[in-house]
């Protein structure tokens, strides 16, 4: 009998080891294995009282995976350990690394900064979906955790907020799944793998580059590892799986409505309660299982960047203790004539492009840093941000909802290094799924944020049928918002003409051309490197003269340099060329910001703050003492 048990154990281990092909990282048509479907960003609390506090970390249904993990780093992908996920594997000689944390700022490899082109450009010729093996660093992670015993009858979900460039996951020696798309969360149902009340081994492996890296050629420092929070959470077996809220206003922009779409696992009635900012009940509704409910509200407070009033919608499934709070704002986005309207009024978008970049954490951005960024934006009259060029941390959208920042929410697509011609990935069938999936997941996850006014399909990735398919899907899925893409130009599938670095004369001619009916909002302009922002006033003279010209997004908000120890032992903010002589580098082009890495305004930020100001006065007749108006 003992021999049979041992034989069965080895057979089970062999089955687990062979469940993944290890070809996923080079297959553009396999972007996930066993990854849970994307849903809107919410947390299901165990009671209304805990839900009111709105801090998932205080919930008994939450368990953080942040902290110190055992870590093993190799320079080349073919040197990676292949059995490290086994329960009895000896990791005593491994290093420690924080999660979240990027490798290069924790002593493993050097940061790479390139603008156009891939980080491997000095060693490897582009050949999608193939990526290098040499210098393709791989990090392997292990950690033992004890899952709460009272989660035994729950479904247990793992949330990995952002992992670059991919991840393979094992639990207790069993293969769970795989995920790509570095800037959106990967969730996995771990219920069949975990043992509540006991120690459990979680192991995952991350490659610096995979086939998806061809879609992540953004102009920023290239780091690897875990960039956002990771945690487990417990759900009832019978539950609200997804909840989407679409606000609207009537033709007079007075009365409001909320269209609530529900996906319920296991069926049952859902009660909906709308609370104002003071916690007072405003309206209620009910829904039978999966479907749609409509909530009408007479003359609600309206959400704008100037008046970011938020209500709370609470959803509870009958027979379940779970309470899901969703922040909602009543606002209406319209494309009328040649303008974008918010609540019936044209808006001037005084924006900037913002990379998620911290001088000490790289991709790891604290709440305090995000609040600092919003404070600076408000101080200098910015009212809009483009999430260049990928979805941001969920918390960033929450804060934009709360403090009032219009958001252009961009999908994680840029393939600039492949060019815009026939070789563009936008025209390749094998990358069609990835283009579509990254846009779908972006919309599915961030749907409920009132601050999001446009979806953006990506950046500098050519144009072709893959983007046309993505546009069609986004517009069908969410007709309440505009959708833009720069490479679609004036006549392609984009609701907004959103060029980059369009000159003064080009802007003027577009505004005076009656055949051009799309709003003009530059997705990038006024490049803020060095002694810059000359001519910015002239741009805004046009914006304030021509109704169809509604502003733009400066490149870019913050200098990207990491804090580094220089050769003389002193602290520096490092450029792309400061680390070694063999990696690709576009040197100091990483610092194009309105503010420095530590968020001190650069001199040209003061010029921007003045031109972006909301209130302008002009003397009517000083000689006769007329009032300034």
Predicted region positions:
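Extended acidic/polar, glycine-enriched regions
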Residues: 195-197, 263-334
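Short strand-turn-strand beta-turns centered on an Asx-Gly dipeptide
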Residues: 170-176, 275-277, 318, 343
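Extended carbohydrate-recognition surfaces in non-catalytic/accessory domains of CAZymes
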Residues: 20-159, 210, 214-218, 223-226, ...
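Accessory beta-strand-rich segments of carbohydrate-active enzymes
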Residues: 24, 55, 70-74, 105, ...
